[in-house]
């Protein structure tokens, strides 16, 4: 209780600062900060200042206080089970997933295949955007990114701050390129390639594909372009729709 006013003050200042920004979708009560009466006081203050946006807080679990249920790092199968639940009408949000450290992130396509199949699943936030290294000169005169322990600091978290989708200078890691592919607003799937049939899904919420894109397709044989043609997209290809289209091409010699 001694910290109640500090909790409430921080939440109130956040809402007053940002509530007129249309890009703010919902409010969070914090990150990995336990759960108790001070958080309930924060929620009351937030709702008194902005009753138009929902509230999430991972540490609250499924407590009635929150409008959005959230978790960190569930396995894909657990996420599918959450998406299939009918006993809780609140949406489900991955406030952290796909830790991008080292050889991560992983299972991006699998996560988003699950998310796309359930209206209950909102999506999620990859931890995290950028590595937190500082450009420093090494003993050999070359430059590299320094992190915990490189400054004589103790204790430290070592390279645990090097876990982003891009380098500190914002050069993309491979994981960011994979995430871009997963996020693409147009999905193309093979139906029967010997007959040239593919399935196209418009993932946009407001755009017709035929009014947005000029489409082409390319056939390659052993990495070399064998054919490239224009593709006329179906008329009125609206948001959320899926259409099958036929591509005209001869089968490559390689089969």
Where are these regions (language model features)?
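Extended substrate-binding grooves/exosites of carbohydrate-active enzymes
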Residues: 1-199, 203-211, 216-224
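Intrinsically disordered, low-complexity Pro/Gly/Ser/Thr-rich segments with frequent PxxP/GP/PP motifs
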Residues: 213-254
């Amino acid at each position: 209780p001694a910290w109640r006013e500090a909790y409430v003050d921080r939440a109130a200042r956040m809402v007053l600062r940002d509530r007129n920004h249309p890009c703010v979708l919902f409010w969070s009560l914090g990150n990995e900060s336990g759960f108790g009466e001070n958080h309930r006081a924060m929620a009351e203050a937030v709702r008194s200042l902005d009753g138009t946006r929902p509230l999430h807080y991972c540490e609250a679990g499924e407590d009635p206080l929150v409008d959005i249920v959230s978790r960190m790092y569930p396995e894909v199968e657990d996420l599918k089970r959450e998406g299939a639940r009918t006993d809780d009408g609140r949406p489900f949000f991955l406030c952290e997933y796909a830790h991008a450290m080292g050889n991560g992130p992983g299972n991006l396509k699998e996560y988003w295949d699950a998310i796309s199949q359930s209206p209950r699943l909102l999506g999620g936030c990859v931890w995290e955007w950028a590595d937190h290294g500082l450009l420093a000169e090494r003993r050999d005169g070359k430059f590299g990114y320094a992190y915990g322990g490189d400054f004589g600091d103790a204790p430290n978290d070592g390279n645990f701050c090097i876990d982003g989708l891009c380098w500190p200078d914002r050069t993309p890691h491979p994981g960011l390129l994979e995430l871009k592919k997963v996020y693409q607003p147009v999905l193309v799937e093979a139906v029967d390639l010997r007959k040239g049939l593919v399935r196209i899904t418009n993932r946009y919420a407001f755009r017709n594909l035929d009014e947005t894109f000029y489409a082409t397709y390319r056939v390659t044989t052993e990495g070399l372009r064998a054919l490239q043609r224009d593709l006329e997209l179906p008329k009125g290809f609206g948001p959320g729709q899926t259409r099958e289209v036929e591509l005209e091409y001869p089968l490559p010699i390689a089969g």
